[in-house]
Amino acid sequence: MDLPGPIHDFLLVFLGSGIILGGLGVVLLTNPIYSAFSLGFVFICISLFYILSNSYFVAAAQLLIYVGAINVLILFAVMFMNGSEYYKDFHLWTLGDGLTSLICTILFLSLITTILDTSWYGILWTTKSNQIIEKDFISNSQQLGILLSTDFFLPFELMSIILLVALLGAIAAARQ
């Protein structure tokens, strides 16, 4: 999207604030339905981020897959569950909860220190984007695949790890 600089910066700050507030709403709201709506708001703000960075295909995929399918599925699952079990014994923490939060905090801090200590400019990627000669003859989906496997390999893998953790959390919540 070609916007003047100050408007673009304002929209980035506005959407970033929306993502942070929505994420806090997901974590801090005690009603699971409100948390699911807050998660949908975060997904919509992320989609608008993609639109601001001229990634219309990724924005459409974000809206269709995450907001349209996954968030609606989460809402249906939460609405069909028994709501009374969320509020009894809410304030009690067991030893397992404390140990789990300690392990998660240690893993998060080690991941952050690894990211900050890594020299990202020294990493050799498998294919550089300047090695692809015939860009005019490649379709948009092929260009997207090439970009995901070269320039955006690290964010793509980090997103897969985040989705894996979310899946494991959903399985753990469903087992209880």
Curated annotation (Swiss-Prot):
Superkingdom as given in the UniProt entry: Eukaryota
Protein known as: NAD(P)H-quinone oxidoreductase subunit 6, chloroplastic
Bilayer-spanning residue ranges: 10-30, 32-52, 61-81, 92-112, 152-172
Cellular component terms per the entry's GO annotation: chloroplast thylakoid membrane
Function: NDH shuttles electrons from NAD(P)H:plastoquinone, via FMN and iron-sulfur (Fe-S) centers, to quinones in the photosynthetic chain and possibly in a chloroplast respiratory chain. The immediate electron acceptor for the enzyme in this species is believed to be plastoquinone. Couples the redox reaction to proton translocation, and thus conserves the redox energy in a proton gradient.
Pfam families: Oxidored_q3
Subunit architecture: NDH is composed of at least 16 different subunits, 5 of which are encoded in the nucleus.
Locations listed in the record: Plastid, Chloroplast thylakoid membrane
Top-level EC class: translocase
Reactions catalysed, as given in the entry: a plastoquinone + NADH + (n+1) H(+)(in) = a plastoquinol + NAD(+) + n H(+)(out); a plastoquinone + NADPH + (n+1) H(+)(in) = a plastoquinol + NADP(+) + n H(+)(out)
GO MF: NADH dehydrogenase (ubiquinone) activity; quinone binding
Enzyme Commission code(s) on record: 7.1.1.-
Membrane topology type: Multi-pass membrane protein
Key words, A-Z: Chloroplast, Membrane, NAD, NADP, Plastid, Plastoquinone, Quinone, Thylakoid, Translocase, Transmembrane, Transmembrane helix, Transport
